[in-house]
């Protein structure tokens, strides 16, 4: 009977041991995710539960896990205690957001706010209530408020984007206009340069005679007419594009509820002219009707067929017309007389090999004027006898430095100087505008949303000083009790740490203002500007974070990015885990 009782006791003890082992392997460990597959024990030959450190350095009894003694070098055996200094404790926070805290804060007698479920304190030193339901409710309420704020700010941001795109289109039109002006100025400079060369190398009487002919006058008039028509056409194109942008804004912002039939009729007629109304009707017929407010920036800019037809240059583009202006009228007249008169024309220049026109190079300076007079007399006799009909001669340069140049040369030189100066100014202006255009995506945001804020300033009174912040301008410290203003720097760039890509929203959330006024016995002042989403622009806070380095917090709708995009980036930054502290 005694033996039977002992056997029963042994069986019961074995069953309890097996049940405890099974329970220990099935119960989630404290301080771990519920699906922590790496914390699963194995049985050895004696059916004892064993477990290896995550770094593989040791094998322990399963009972050594979370026994408040650090056995593993990597601290992986104590996820739920403070025994290992470098490990992390996982708070489930059911009803709120999970979080990790350092293991040294476990069972330290302090209720950590990150663990709203109180799981970090379980040794009886202090009782931490489970506040996750309340905290989660407050967090979700705050999240909804932030989302509403972001959506309201995003609508203002859309207006900034529309304004930025409008300014970009105007800049494109101005560049196109200047490109034509540069082309015309280049041709004028070349023409005046040729006239200067001709004035310096040709006989004045012959040129004056040609200039007075009706043919020369007609050629000049035709070329001037072509240039004037081209400039006028370019100006009309630019004005057409500008008016189209203005009407786009009217069509986009028009409110039909005001029942202004005149404006409504004008908007409907304009949409029909642009083809927008037909496109909208087609979209309605196919069921592709977007929600109100969605894609409101690009609603008008889809159809440009009518505008492109008006801007098309047809069979006579400027590249073709410019060929008619490349020749000087005098050269055209000379070529027009070619063929029948080539055998009678005599050309002479410094490069001609004829001895008649180079003999003065071998004569003493005092005899050269008499020789030139004799040559002129001979040429006049030949021309009157119809032996030759035309002559171009280069007279030898006078060795007398005080002799003034002919009036025709002076006039031609002044005209060429003015044309060259105009070309230089126009080219510089065009280069400057192209530089501004290239900065749109790198300076004013991915969608040019910051362009509308350029040089707009906002200030905040901080007691002793008032701080003024200007978008893409200066940051200034202004004493409230009088005194000189101090520059904290001018805008330099976004992303001062150079650790993010322009495709990321976080890239546009921080600016640096550098090269401010030098501190006394210190470096130049600078400021780091942190931007956050809001429905209005304002300076929130300013303080001197380090010596001569200021921190400025600014609210602006320009950084109210689409919520889905920001949430995806936030998840990526957190390594795929959404971890939130208590608000």
Curated annotation (Swiss-Prot):
InterPro entries: Gtb1-like, Man6P_isomerase_rcpt-bd_dom_sf, MRH_dom, PRKCSH, PRKCSH_N. It is found in: Endoplasmic reticulum. A motif (Prevents secretion from ER) lies at residues 580-583. Disulfide bonds join 91-115, 457-470, 519-548, 533-560. Keywords: Coiled coil, Disulfide bond, Endoplasmic reticulum, Signal. GO terms for cellular component: glucosidase II complex. It comes from the Eukaryota. Residues 130-252 form a coiled coil. Its main location: endoplasmic reticulum. PROSITE patterns: ER_TARGET, MRH. Residues 455-562 form the MRH domain. One of its GO terms (biological process) is N-glycan processing. Residues 1-26 form the signal peptide. Heterodimer of a catalytic subunit alpha and a subunit beta. Subunit of glucosidase 2, which cleaves sequentially the 2 innermost alpha-1,3-linked glucose residues from the Glc(2)Man(9)GlcNAc(2) oligosaccharide precursor of immature glycoproteins in the endoplasmic reticulum (ER). Specifically required for the cleavage of the final glucose. The subunit beta retains the catalytic subunit alpha in the ER. This is Glucosidase 2 subunit beta. It comes from Mycosarcoma maydis.
């Amino acid at each position: 009977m005694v033996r039977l009782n002992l056997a029963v006791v042994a069986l019961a003890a074995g069953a309890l041991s097996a049940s405890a082992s099974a329970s220990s392997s099935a119960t989630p460990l404290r301080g771990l995710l519920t699906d922590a597959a790496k914390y699963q024990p194995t049985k050895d030959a004696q059916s004892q539960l064993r477990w290896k450190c995550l770094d593989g350095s040791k094998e322990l009894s399963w009972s050594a896990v979370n026994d408040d003694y650090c056995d593993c070098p990597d601290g992986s055996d104590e996820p739920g205690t403070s025994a290992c200094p470098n490990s992390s404790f996982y708070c489930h926070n059911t009803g709120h957001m999970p979080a990790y805290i350092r293991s040294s804060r476990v069972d330290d007698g302090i209720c950590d706010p990150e663990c709203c479920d109180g799981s970090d304190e379980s040794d009886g030193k202090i009782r931490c209530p489970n506040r996750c339901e309340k905290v989660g409710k407050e967090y979700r309420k705050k999240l909804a408020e932030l989302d509403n704020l972001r959506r309201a700010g995003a609508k203002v941001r859309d207006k900034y984007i529309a304004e930025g795109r409008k300014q970009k289109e105007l800049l494109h039109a101005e560049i196109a206009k200047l490109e034509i002006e540069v082309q015309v100025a280049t041709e004028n400079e070349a023409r005046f340069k040729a006239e200067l060369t001709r004035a310096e190398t040709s006989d004045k009487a012959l040129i004056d005679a040609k200039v007075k002919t009706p043919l020369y006058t007609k050629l000049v008039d035709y070329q001037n007419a072509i240039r004037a028509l081209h400039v006028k056409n370019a100006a009309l194109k630019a004005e057409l594009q500008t008016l189209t942008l203005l009407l786009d804004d009217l069509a986009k912002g028009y409110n039909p509820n005001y029942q202004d039939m005149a404006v409504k009729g004008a908007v409907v007629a304009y949409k029909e002219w642009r083809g927008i109304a037909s496109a909208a009707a087609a979209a309605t017929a196919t069921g592709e009707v977007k929600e109100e407010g969605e894609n409101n920036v690009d609603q008008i800019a889809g159809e440009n067929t009518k505008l492109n037809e008006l801007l098309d240059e047809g069979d006579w583009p400027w590249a073709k017309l410019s060929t008619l202006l490349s020749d000087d009228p005098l050269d055209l007249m000379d070529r027009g007389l070619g063929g029948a008169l080539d055998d009678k024309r005599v050309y002479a220049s410094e490069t001609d090999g004829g001895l008649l026109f180079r003999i003065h190079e071998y004569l003493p300076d005092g005899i050269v004027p008499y020789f030139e007079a004799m040559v002129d007399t001979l040429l006049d006799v030949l021309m009157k006898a119809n032996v030759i009909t035309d002559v171009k001669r280069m007279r030898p340069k006078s060795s007398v430095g005080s002799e003034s140049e002919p009036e025709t040369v002076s006039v031609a030189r002044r005209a060429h100087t003015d044309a060259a100066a105009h070309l230089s100014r126009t080219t510089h202006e065009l280069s400057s505008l192209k530089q501004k255009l290239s900065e749109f995506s790198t300076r004013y945001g991915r969608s040019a949303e910051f362009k509308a804020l350029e040089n707009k300033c906002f200030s905040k009174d901080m007691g002793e000083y008032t701080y003024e912040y200007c978008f893409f301008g200066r940051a200034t410290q202004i004493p409230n009790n009088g005194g000189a203003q101090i520059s904290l720097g001018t805008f330099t760039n976004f992303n001062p740490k150079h650790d993010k890509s322009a495709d990321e929203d976080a890239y546009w959330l921080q600016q640096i203002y550098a090269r401010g006024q030098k501190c006394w016995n210190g470096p130049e002042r600078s400021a780091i500007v942190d931007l956050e989403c809001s429905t209005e622009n304002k300076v929130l806070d300013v303080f001197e974070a380090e010596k001569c380095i200021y921190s400025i917090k600014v609210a602006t709708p320009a950084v109210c990015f689409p919520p889905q995009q920001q949430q995806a980036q936030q998840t990526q930054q957190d390594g795929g885990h959404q971890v939130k502290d208590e608000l």
